[in-house]
Amino acid sequence: MVLIIEIIKIGQIGPIGQRGQSGQRGQSGQRGQSGQIGQSGQSGQSGQSGQSGQIGQIGQIGQIGQIGQIGQIGQIGQARRTGRTGRTVHRRMLQASSSFNISPDISICRRATRNMGEEERPLGC
């Protein structure tokens, strides 16, 4: 009888082991999640602004230099305006062609000299 009572008393000491639950304080290690601040490294994506280098493609605007071919229109005007001799037509067309490095247009030459005889037409017409 005496032994049983002592065993029961010793068993009551067991609940003191609940103090071991204070080990939950170890969960404060979650503070280590503050390492997520390292995600601010995503700001490195601002390097995409480097794509602004595509502006260099604007250099294709240099193709506008083809507008210089509009000088051919000048040949048409000069050929039509001259109603004089075929030599005048020929000279004016050669002036236009030499300044733009292009050959005289035969059809323009023929139209401008259609009222002339074969002898009066300049060479190439």
UniProtKB/Swiss-Prot annotation:
Residues 11-79 are annotated as: 23 X 3 AA approximate tandem repeats of G-Q-I/R/S. GO terms for biological process: cell adhesion. Residues 15-57 are annotated as: Disordered. Keywords: Cell adhesion, Repeat, Secreted, Virulence. G-Q-I/R/S repeats lie at residues 11-13, 14-16, 17-19, 20-22, 23-25, 26-28, 29-31, 32-34, 35-37, 38-40, 41-43, 44-46, 47-49, 50-52, 53-55, 56-58, 59-61, 62-64, 65-67, 68-70, 71-73, 74-76, 77-79. Disruption phenotype: Impairs the formation of the hypoxia-typic morphotype, increases surface adherence and reduces the hypoxia fitness. Coiled coil: none annotated. GO terms for cellular component: extracellular region. The keyword Glycoprotein does not apply. It is found in: Secreted. Induction: Expression is regulated by the hypoxia responsive morphology factor A (hrmA). It comes from the Eukaryota. Pfam families: Collagen (PF01391). Contains a tripeptide G-Q-I/S/R repeated region and lacks a canonical secretion signal. Hypoxia responsive morphology factor that modulates the expression of the subtelomeric hrmA-associated cluster (HAC) containing genes that alter the hyphal surface (such as reduced total chitin or increased beta-glucan exposure) and perturb inter-hyphal interactions within the developing biofilms, resulting in a loss of vertically aligned polarized growing filaments. This is Subtelomeric hrmA-associated cluster protein cgnA. It comes from Aspergillus fumigatus (strain CBS 144.89 / FGSC A1163 / CEA10) (Neosartorya fumigata). The gene is cgnA.
